[in-house]
Amino acid sequence: MTMINPLSYPVPSQYSYTYNNNNNNSNNSSNNNSNNNSNNNNNNNNNCGVPNVSYGSNLNQQSMAQDLRVPEQYSISSPSPKKRPFNSTMTTSPPTPTLLSNSPYIHGSHIVPQYSPQLQNVYNTPHQSSHSIHQPPQQTPNIFNNNNNNNNNNEKSNNQNFGNTLFNSITNNSSNSSNSLIQQNNLTNNGSSSSSSSSSSTNFNQNNNFINSSNDSIYNSNICSFYGNTSSSSSSSLNGIESPPSVELMDDDIEDQLREYISPVIWGMMDNYAREQFYNAIVEFINEEISFRSLLLELRVIAVMDVNYKSIFQFLVDLFLSIEPNQKMVNYLRDNGVEENEFNIDLKSLELSSDNDSNQKKKRERIRKSVSRGLRNPPNKWAKEESQKLIQLVHEHGDKQWKKIAHQIGGGKTGAQCAQHWKRVLCPAIRKGSWDEDEESKLFNLVEKHGQSWKNVASEIRTRTDIQCRYQYFKSCMSREVQWSSREDEILQKKVSENNQQDGTININNTRDISWMDVSKAMARGRQTKIPRTALECKTRYFQLNFGGAPIQIVVPHNDDHLNNPHSPLNSLLQDQNCY
């Protein structure tokens, strides 16, 4: 490994022995200074970008001319680049899922293609455990630790929010299972571990220089930062390939299943350059530099080493549709630039299945609502036979035992509904139609007594329901807010004369025989006002025009307390000059 010239970059005296002492002394020094450098060692173990190697006598054989300065793009003082490379060596792919079992690349023994030198450099290198070098704790000045720590912290923060951010941007109203799908692109981003010392070799130290102009070695040494850091002290080999890294199981089984789908594509079907492209596209999308449509455009050009899946874009489209095969997902992908020929499913059959599913869902919803209505809130419509049976049962059991009556009627009717239907519709004491002047005057007196407690008002009126009382009261108040016109006065005088005419003469003294309800209906036919005049209003207006003076006081039998109160709501309503 190429080291930094201590003459060019001054090193404190307490660290200078690591450049001159041999391997045996380094072990003793590490034990003596373990307490002082514990925090530094923890940081070094978390940084998979800087390999921990021993600095023995083999480094002294290298001439000082070989110690070059740090390149400008990787200078110590320069900030970390925007698009950061990966931070660890690549590990092998996990077992192949069922979805990719037909792939010509995955099928068989996972042989690395010849045109992928990066993969062969890692995968096809024999496991040389006998030549491994003991690695003492890192005690040299952490020249690259600051930058690497910043990179790792940024990458961890991005990776932690990667799944939720990307999923919320991709499928706004999709199911929660799609969130697990996008999270698998991290491939255990939050897992933290250090590289194994037993699997390191001299060949690894020679071919993986951190300061190197070759981008391949940088990608090769920094891949762990995005795809997750893994560790395994003992790894078995299969056909010359190490076993897949140990992955911590998630709480949700769906996440484990989705990881099995995506892991073979990322690890076994993409080279380092494709992973770099994929990583940069994801970072730009998370930083809201590009839209989801632009992200799909960039994913189109990232090729994978499989003839079945030409790009990671096509793989993700197929995976989206396999996770959520419905028309809603198809429409969303179409809106973001996916063409018809890029769907590897039969859209017509999908539409038919979606229609069937929607119909079944609507049918289940109707059944659920009907059952709910039948048990708790059945429809208000009563059949003629049910109404007749209710009348018969009320005559037999009275108007108090509504639960017993409802049980005998059946059909999901409750006792409250039977009582309501009887009191509001079927009770012979309840009057229908217009209110006469006596009912209306009694209504205003009861409103003055009980306020707008319509149940109490209706219980004393006895001939009207609570709904009828409420409606009539507000209609009367609104009608009195409109002043009488001269045309209305003429029609009122004419209708009263026609109703009270006897033998061609008008009996002014016999106003009790006048049907003010008929007069009110005749006034309503003239359509002079939007709200028809009530019977009490017509009577009051007629006495004001013919007899003069203050409006007539309506006396309700057995309840004349309101006459003693000149400021009562009834008298104030009747005496309001704007009403006449």
From Swiss-Prot:
<dbReference type="InterPro" id="IPR009057">
    <property type="entry name" value="Homeodomain-like_sf"/>
</dbReference>
<feature type="domain" description="HTH myb-type 1">
    <location>
        <begin position="368"/>
        <end position="430"/>
    </location>
</feature>
<feature type="DNA-binding region" description="H-T-H motif">
    <location>
        <begin position="454"/>
        <end position="478"/>
    </location>
</feature>
<keyword id="KW-0677">Repeat</keyword>
<dbReference type="GO" id="GO:0006355">
    <property type="term" value="P:regulation of DNA-templated transcription"/>
</dbReference>
<keyword id="KW-0804">Transcription</keyword>
<dbReference type="GO" id="GO:0031154">
    <property type="term" value="P:culmination involved in sorocarp development"/>
</dbReference>
<dbReference type="GO" id="GO:0005634">
    <property type="term" value="C:nucleus"/>
</dbReference>
<protein>
    <recommendedName>
        <fullName>Myb-like protein C</fullName>
    </recommendedName>
</protein>
<feature type="compositionally biased region" description="Low complexity">
    <location>
        <begin position="126"/>
        <end position="203"/>
    </location>
</feature>
<dbReference type="Pfam" id="PF00249">
    <property type="entry name" value="Myb_DNA-binding"/>
</dbReference>
<feature type="compositionally biased region" description="Basic residues">
    <location>
        <begin position="361"/>
        <end position="371"/>
    </location>
</feature>
<keyword id="KW-0539">Nucleus</keyword>
<feature type="compositionally biased region" description="Low complexity">
    <location>
        <begin position="87"/>
        <end position="101"/>
    </location>
</feature>
<dbReference type="InterPro" id="IPR051575">
    <property type="entry name" value="Myb-like_DNA-bd"/>
</dbReference>
<dbReference type="InterPro" id="IPR017930">
    <property type="entry name" value="Myb_dom"/>
</dbReference>
<keyword id="KW-0217">Developmental protein</keyword>
<feature type="compositionally biased region" description="Low complexity">
    <location>
        <begin position="20"/>
        <end position="47"/>
    </location>
</feature>
<feature type="region of interest" description="Disordered">
    <location>
        <begin position="1"/>
        <end position="58"/>
    </location>
</feature>
<dbReference type="GO" id="GO:0010628">
    <property type="term" value="P:positive regulation of gene expression"/>
</dbReference>
<feature type="DNA-binding region" description="H-T-H motif">
    <location>
        <begin position="402"/>
        <end position="426"/>
    </location>
</feature>
<feature type="domain" description="Myb-like">
    <location>
        <begin position="484"/>
        <end position="546"/>
    </location>
</feature>
<dbReference type="InterPro" id="IPR001005">
    <property type="entry name" value="SANT/Myb"/>
</dbReference>
<keyword id="KW-0238">DNA-binding</keyword>
<keyword id="KW-0010">Activator</keyword>
<feature type="domain" description="HTH myb-type 2">
    <location>
        <begin position="431"/>
        <end position="482"/>
    </location>
</feature>
<feature type="region of interest" description="Disordered">
    <location>
        <begin position="354"/>
        <end position="380"/>
    </location>
</feature>
<feature type="region of interest" description="Disordered">
    <location>
        <begin position="73"/>
        <end position="101"/>
    </location>
</feature>
<comment type="function">
    <text>Transcription activator required for the culmination, at the time of the fruiting body formation. Regulates genes involved in the cell differentiation within the fruiting body.</text>
</comment>
<feature type="region of interest" description="Disordered">
    <location>
        <begin position="121"/>
        <end position="203"/>
    </location>
</feature>
<dbReference type="GO" id="GO:0000981">
    <property type="term" value="F:DNA-binding transcription factor activity, RNA polymerase II-specific"/>
</dbReference>
<keyword id="KW-0805">Transcription regulation</keyword>
<dbReference type="GO" id="GO:0000978">
    <property type="term" value="F:RNA polymerase II cis-regulatory region sequence-specific DNA binding"/>
</dbReference>
